[in-house]
Structures are given as C-alpha cells and as structure tokens.
Amino acid sequence: MARKTFFSFHFKQDNWRASQVRNSWVTQDRKAAGFFDSAEWEEVKKKDNSDIKKWIDKQLEGTSVTVVLIGEKTAGRKWIDYEIESSHGKKNGLLGIYIHNKKDSDGNTSNKGRNPFSDWYITRNDEKVYFTELYETYDWVN
C-alpha cells in the first residue's frame, strides 16, 4: 500500500542530499510530499510566520508518514520543529534518517547532527517520554 510521505529537512544545507534520498524512491510505489521547487521555498520564506505555517500545513495534507532527514544543523530549527510538532499532532508516523554521510553537490559529507526528536516529549503516567523513545532513527547507507 502506498503512503504519502512528507520529508522534513534543512533546506539550505541539505536540499541536495534530500533530493538524492527522494530520487532513490522513484521506482518505488510511494508518493512524496515535502519536496518543492527551490524558487517556491525562496518565495514562501519571505512571508510572515502564519503564512509559512499555512504553507507547511498544506504540504502535510494527506500524508501519513513524516521522514525527518537529519543533517548537521537540522535540530532546533524553527520550521523543522513545527513540522515535527504538526506531524505528531496529526498522528503521522515519524522516522529520522541521518544524512550527514550522504555527499552534497560538491562531493562533501558533513558532521553528524543532533537528533531533533530529543527536543520533544509527551507525558505518560506523569513521566516524560521523549520522541527518541517513540520514533526510530537510522543512518542513510549509500
């Protein structure tokens, strides 16, 4: 069964890597959301926060899975956090993939980034349960 997947990533730093990950699925029975023309993102990011949130919410519509592509500077970014929070709120499955070892357009890799799931938790039986305990992360294998 095909699932529509939203990809969350640090656009400026990891767009090339994210595109490579997306293209690895081309022959698979999957649909991807969260990939957009760079000119579109350049226009969107000029808008105010409420317009950006609306745009992200529209990208998340119809998705059931959110894959957070974790690069060196992904964790703690405002829009990554919003995408994680929104995805969890709409009960999307979440999955983290470290992409620091994937080469960028210049052939360079980067340092492993902090897991953004470590910033988020739910309360269960009066105890914090961090997203790192709820959602798996993996390393991208070239």
Regions found by a protein language model. Give the residues of each.
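C-terminal interaction surface of TIR/SEFIR-family domains
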Residues: 4-6, 105-142
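Conserved N-terminal substructure of TIR/SEFIR domains
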Residues: 1-62
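Flexible, active-site-adjacent loop/turn segments at secondary-structure boundaries
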Residues: 50, 77-78, 115
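Conserved nucleotide-binding/hydrolysis micro-motifs of P-loop NTPases
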Residues: 12-14, 101-104
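Anion (oxyanion) recognition and catalysis
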Residues: 88
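Conserved beta-strand termini and adjacent loop/short-helix elements that scaffold enzyme active sites
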Residues: 36-38, 97, 131-134
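Conserved beta-strand-loop-alpha-helix hinge of the TIR/SEFIR fold
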Residues: 59-85, 93-103
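A short acidic (Asp/Glu
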Residues: 18-19, 78-81, 106-108
